[in-house]
């Protein structure tokens, strides 16, 4: 039986209607959420603000990286205000070996991005880039679709303060930090991951 998730946009997003999303279909999840004009926010960052849905918890902020938590899984959000300010274009090549690989370029949106999901052992590595921000996670198959749903909400609600960012770009510290956490490089080979295993077989983040 297909699972359906009822999304109350009155409380969560635009306040227009109740939408049912087939959560077995990643394309549908992404397309429906990105088709809305999401304007709510409940978190502030340095030069931007964004919204995290009910059930997602903000754990910590380390410079430009935000650690989020949902249903036993961690999501890592990085917002690239430098790329936003300079309107940096993205390069993406569809990965035919990935579990899911798709470029995002909706006709009615100026924002661009991509989603890539790669299966590693019994887990799924999610690499979701949209609106000059990235969410990464390593999740179980059971949590994959809800992770994509939450990531789509979060990335689509990011709003930038260009004036404040311009002031911040004069800060050498910020530029150094942006370089340190330069996660916005597309990997041409499937074996390259930001997530790596250590000698004991534990997953570690490489940044």
Region spans (language model):
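N-terminal "mature-domain start" segment
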Residues: 23-64
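C-terminal motif of bacterial Sec signal peptides marking the signal peptidase cleavage site
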Residues: 14-15
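Positively charged n-region of N-terminal signal peptides that target proteins for export
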Residues: 1-4
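Conserved polar/disulfide-associated segments of primarily extracytoplasmic proteins
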Residues: 60-147
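Sec-dependent N-terminal signal peptides
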Residues: 6-9
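Surface-exposed amphipathic alpha-helical segments
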Residues: 137-207
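Short, conserved catalytic or interaction motifs in soluble domains
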Residues: 18
């Amino acid at each position: 039986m297909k699972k359906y998730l009822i999304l109350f946009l009155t409380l969560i997003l635009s306040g227009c209607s109740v939408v049912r999303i087939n959560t077995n279909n990643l394309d549908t999840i992404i397309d429906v959420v990105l088709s809305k004009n999401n304007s709510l926010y409940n978190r502030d960052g340095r030069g931007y603000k964004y919204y995290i849905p009910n059930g997602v918890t903000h754990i910590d902020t380390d410079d430009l990286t935000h650690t989020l938590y949902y249903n036993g899984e961690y999501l890592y959000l990085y917002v690239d205000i430098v790329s936003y300010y300079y309107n940096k274009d993205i390069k993406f090549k569809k990965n035919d070996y990935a579990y899911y690989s798709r470029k995002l370029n909706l006709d009615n949106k100026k924002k661009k991005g991509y989603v890539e999901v790669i299966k590693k052992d019994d887990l799924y590595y999610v690499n979701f880039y949209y609106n000059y921000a990235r969410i990464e996670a390593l999740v179980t198959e059971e949590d994959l679709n809800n992770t994509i749903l939450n990531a789509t909400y979060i990335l689509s609600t990011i709003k930038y303060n260009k004036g404040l960012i311009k002031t911040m770009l004069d800060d050498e510290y910020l530029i150094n930090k942006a370089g340190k956490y330069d996660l916005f490089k597309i990997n041409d080979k499937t074996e390259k991951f930001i997530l790596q295993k250590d000698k004991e077989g534990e997953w570690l983040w490489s940044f």
